[in-house]
UniProtKB/Swiss-Prot annotation:
Organism classification: Bacteria, Pseudomonadati, Chlorobiota, Chlorobiia, Chlorobiales
Originating species: Chlorobium phaeobacteroides (strain BS1)
Gene Ontology cellular-component annotations: cytoplasm
Protein name, entry field: Ribonuclease H
Membrane-spanning segments: none
Keyword Endoplasmic reticulum part of the UniProt annotation: no
Amino acid sequence: MQKKVTIYTDGACSGNPGKGGWGALLMFGSVKRELSGYSPATTNNRMELMAAIQALEALKEPCEVALYSDSSYLVNAINKGWLKRWTSNNWKTAAKKPVENIDLWKMILELIRLHSVTFHKVKGHSDNEFNNRCDYLATQAIKNNR
């Protein structure tokens, strides 16, 4: 039986594009682990994806994951089938334009094949303490350039 892990993620950007940061909170039972990172030149969407990637990569074995994000871009791509359509359309959108951030989407595809992941949308900058913590981690990563 796989371990059940809850993950919250958030990405932030100072300017879009601009300096970016991401934050993640992984929870397994009573254990909590915080992760964050920085990029000197990026976009908000890339940081949202990177938060999910880094959190899933931090898992040491295949897990059952509930991943919570305030990013409609991330959650809708999975839950509304956009990612599946993009891959079957040779990485083209419904408008026949190239999908942005293909490198990161390919990483997410690999990770969701390894783990059993369900994606959940949460309201950003609201009263969700875990999402707010990830936002803090992401903005601090930008502030501290690391």
